[in-house]
Amino acid sequence: FTVSTAGNTDMLIIGGGGAGGVGSGSGGGAGAFLEISQGYLSSGTNAVVVGDGGTGQAVPSSSGSSAGNNGKASSVGSYFAPGGGGGVGGLLTTASNLYTTINGLNGGSGSGGAGGTVASGSSGGLGVSGLGNNGGLVAVGILRAGGGGGGAGAVGLSPAINDAGANGGAGKSSSITGSAVVLAGGGGSGAGTNGGTGGSGGGGNGSNLKTGVAGTVNTGSGGGGANQTTVNAIGGSGGSGIVIIRYAV
């Protein structure tokens, strides 16, 4: 982005969303939501990067789980918005063929904690203060359901009962284009009976089957988690981020 005369401008910078996990998989976290009023840009070329959403990772064998990748950061010059945390899946224990819970991953907004068939509980990943929110935790005693990914406007939710997915955290509104639009929702989690709903602003829905729903492109939203641990089961990819620069002409 080339600036002829140094000065201040309004910017919205959102990182790419994290992908959902597989195996009572948690929802991916939204990318960081950085809105700047009258931020300074120097004259000359200011590098602009729009972060990709994290990709879902397919289960490589006949039984197992997988974690989604974190989203990539977006930036304008020195202004930086990290990507969202990738969702996680319950860890297969070879001795008993049970799935233990795993804590969510940190990011712009954190992913939810994974569920499992061992009721040990898990924590959601941490979001960046002021730019995102934490993912939803899974309480001790809850089985086969992950936590929702954090959204820019709210924390990811936690599953209330066995086998019922948790919703992703709500996105956040911006009026930088002149009209209010909600972006950067968290992904819903996978679960045994029904997946959680993605957060407003483009979060992907979770699934009780083998494929989570992707976050919406150019919203920085998290992807939905998947439940089944069969070969090629995959979490939904995170939505790519977005950069908007508003300046006088």
Regions found by a protein language model. Name each.
Residues 1-6:
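Short amphipathic alpha-helices and their capping/turn segments at secondary-structure boundaries
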Residues 8-249:
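Low-complexity, glycine/proline-biased repetitive segments and flexible coils/loops
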